[in-house]
Regions:
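Nucleotide-activated sugar donor-binding and catalytic core shared by glycosyltransferases
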Residues: 1-35, 40-180
Length: 180
């Protein structure tokens, strides 16, 4: 699964990533790519020019959040420049190759759920190859502790309210980076 739309990546950086992606799909017959293409004319043009005629690269319309999460959960890994995807994918156990040189989500890099790749085509291809061929690396990223939560916030809120009213023990705290 690929998403790429940031203005900073439009133009040559985006074209470089798309070229690398196409080369990887050409070299590896088992790779299928789904790319919900952003509505930006610059993104549409680059995607259609470089990826549009490949039978294993599927350019589709942008998805609503439920359909996107459904697709992401069925993906092997995700390549994206989206901050939201960087936060959501770890909840699905999906490694993310971040198509940027920096991120506003350094906790994801620190936890091991994200890897900064940038837009250099050589780095993109090398990192994709590593994730596709190194099962240990894949499992390490896929099973890393989600730094954005463990899915138990509602339980903790209910427990905290009960505790406040003297109806139970204090809620267990979430500690970023600790594996259960």
């Amino acid at each position: 699964l690929v998403t790429m739309h940031r203005r900073e990546n439009q133009g040559q950086p985006m074209r470089a990533v798309f070229g690398a992606l196409r080369e990887m799909v050409d070299q590896e017959p088992t790779i299928e790519v789904v790319y919900p293409v952003h509505l930006s004319p610059a993104v549409q043009e680059a995607a259609n020019d470089l990826l549009g005629d490949h039978d294993r690269i599927h350019l589709i319309a942008p998805l609503d959040v439920l359909d996107f999460h459904n697709l992401a959960s069925r993906s092997y890994f995700i390549m994206s420049d989206s901050g939201g995807v960087q936060e959501e994918a770890p909840s699905l156990g999906k490694p993310v190759l971040v198509l940027r040189d920096t991120t506003e989500r350094p906790e994801g890099v620190k936890a091991g759920t994200l890897k900064l790749v940038g837009t250099d085509p050589t780095v993109v291809k090398t990192t994709m190859t590593e994730l596709l061929t190194n099962e240990s690396l894949y499992l390490q990223m896929a099973n890393a502790r989600n730094p954005y939560g463990d899915g138990r916030a509602s339980e903790r809120i209910v427990q905290a309210i009960k505790h406040y009213f003297g109806q139970g023990e204090a809620a267990e705290e979430f500690h970023e980076g600790e594996k259960e």
